[in-house]
Swiss-Prot record:
Source organism: Bacillus cereus (strain AH820)
GO BP term, example: menaquinone biosynthetic process
Matches recorded under PANTHER family: LONG-CHAIN-FATTY-ACID--COA LIGASE (PTHR43767), NONRIBOSOMAL PEPTIDE SYNTHASE PES1 (EUROFUNG)-RELATED (PTHR43767:SF1)
Protein known as: 2-succinylbenzoate--CoA ligase
Signal peptide residue numbers: none
GO molecular function (one): ATP binding
UniProt entry tagged with the keyword Transferase: no
HAMAP family to which the protein is assigned, alphabetical: MenE
Enzyme Commission number(s) of this protein: 6.2.1.26
Annotated catalysed reactions: 2-succinylbenzoate + ATP + CoA = 2-succinylbenzoyl-CoA + AMP + diphosphate
């Protein structure tokens, strides 16, 4: 088994120096230019004391600066702890303390008493020091730590090794194929594993990336039509935004793949994509699996509507209930295994032992496999609403709500109920005139009685994280305050 590999970006710059690596707005950077920038950043970081094996927090927005910092830390042999720019100061301080970082590199205004904070601009204006650049990467070494969104309890730092990132990129290429003219539009934040994984694919495949600094549906819509984009990663909300802008039109046939993640997609949305010939590949993955671990190819978009597909070539997947593997169509916990799966959480041995057993990761997600082995993700176990002993999946109710023409967005959570234990409550963003009664009546026609929300509340917008995933915990707080 391969233990080490040549430094990825350095090798890529050697193999295809003049090929475009990154496009951002009107700027183009080749792989050799990117390598040179990274060496320079690495020398500046060496001057401020960054050494091999240390953990360095990165709080930056999508841009060439953030890309160079992430690569520079790998050149130095340090571990990048990627922080979510949308978190509060308290949450960020907690994560930095938990990860035992030696400093923070940021492009934002941030003050911390106990941790040295270096602004990227200051570091780059300061002196350089000769750096000892890692010529090889050990696949067993940690490359990044990314905190889980903490949908349950305190966030946990997921350790991803060079080997995890390599396996993820290889698995994806065996699944989607590679083409010389590939260009991946990157609009996911790079502090999330979905965004970060594109940086890995960029240097491993030698593939051009069109980087969008912040989510801008108008720019992305136009770029898909004019910039030669072949692949884009999206979540349902982004796809809905793009379809609105597309209207009666279509995207060029060169767009060969829309990789859709971030939870089960509403059927009406997928049906619209089929009508328009947009190749949507539904995926399932998480921080712990270094991004996707399952993908449904566009061939099955309609015959397997709602499925997340089958595992990547080097991955395995099964459904367990109470530690026993269950037959097709039986619901249970999704359990996965593969070289892209994390070895554990930083300083959380209990959580690691609980989650990973004999190399199998217990995801905390509920789903089932059909008779052909296609995965259907039902919901997060923690999002499950149990009403009078019946399991209710919020995603199913949301799908019904989203099929109403006057509903733009929908989120469903459990609400405490004296009689049933829990009942569903819906939060809706309107796209036209509609009343609570009309919404509930609409649900009554399409859902079992016990699944119909007991109330529907209107919001201007739903709470979402930086990758546009619905934050149900914030909806739960709203329910508690009612």
């Amino acid at each position: 088994m391969m233990e080490t590999m040549p430094n990825w970006l350095k090798q890529r710059a050697f193999l295809t120096p003049d090929r475009t690596a990154i496009e951002i707005e009107e700027e183009k950077v080749t792989f050799m230019q990117l390598h040179e920038k990274v060496v320079s950043v690495c020398e500046h970081l060496t001057h401020v004391g960054v050494k091999r094996g240390q953990k360095v927090a990165v709080l930056m927005k999508n841009g060439i600066e953030m890309i160079t910092v992430i690569h520079a830390l790998s050149y130095a042999g340090a571990v990048a702890v990627l922080l979510n720019t949308r978190l509060s100061r308290e949450e960020l301080l907690w994560q930095m303390d938990d990860a035992e970082v030696i400093c923070l590199v940021t492009d934002q205004d941030f003050e911390a008493k106990d941790i040295p904070v270096y602004s990227f601009a200051e570091v780059m204006n300061g002196p350089k020091e000769e750096a000892s650049i890692q010529e090889e990467f050990s696949l067993r070494e940690a490359m990044t730590i990314i905190y889980t969104s903490g949908t349950t309890g305190k966030p946990k730092g997921v350790i991803l090794t060079y080997g995890n990132h390599w396996a993820s990129a290889v698995g994806s290429s065996l699944n989607l194929g590679l083409r010389d003219d590939d260009c991946w539009l990157a609009c996911m934040p790079m502090f999330h594993v979905g965004g970060l994984s594109l940086l890995m694919k960029n240097i491993m495949y030698g593939m051009r990336i069109l980087l969008v600094p912040k989510y801008d549906a108008d720019f992305i819509h136009k770029a898909l039509q004019t910039r030669g984009v072949t692949i884009i990663s999206v979540v349902s909300k982004m796809l809905t935004d793009l379809l609105e802008r597309l209207g009666e039109g279509t995207y060029p046939s060169s767009l060969r793949c829309m990789l859709l993640g971030g939870g089960p997609a509403p059927k009406p949305l997928l049906e619209t994509c089929v009508d328009k010939g947009i190749p949507v590949y539904q995926t399932y993955g998480m921080t712990e699996t270094s991004s996707q671990i399952c993908t449904l190819s566009a061939d099955y978009m309609l015959t397997k509507v709602g499925s997340a597909g089958k595992p990547l070539f080097q991955c395995q997947l099964r459904i367990e209930k109470d530690g026993v593997v269950v037959p097709p169509f039986a619901e249970g916990e999704i359990v996965v295994k593969g070289p892209n799966v994390t070895g554990g959480y930083f300083n959380r041995e209990d959580a690691t032992r609980e989650t990973i057993q004999n190399g199998w990761l217990h995801t905390g997600d509920l789903g089932y496999l059909d008779e052909e082995g296609f995965l259907y993700v039902l919901d997060r176990r923690s999002d499950l609403i149990i009403s009078g002993g019946e399991n209710i999946y919020p995603a199913q109710i949301e799908e019904v709500l989203l099929s109403h023409p006057m509903v733009a967005e929908a989120g469903v959570v459990g609400m405490t109920d004296d009689k049933w234990g829990q009942v569903p409550a819906a939060f809706v963003v309107k796209s036209g005139e509609i009343t609570e009664e009309e919404i509930l009546h609409f649900c009554e026609e399409k859902l079992a009685k016990y699944k119909v929300p007991k109330k529907a509340c209107f919001l201007e917008e739903l709470p979402r994280n930086a990758s546009k995933k619905l934050l149900r915990r914030e909806l739960r707080q709203l329910v508690e305050e009612m």
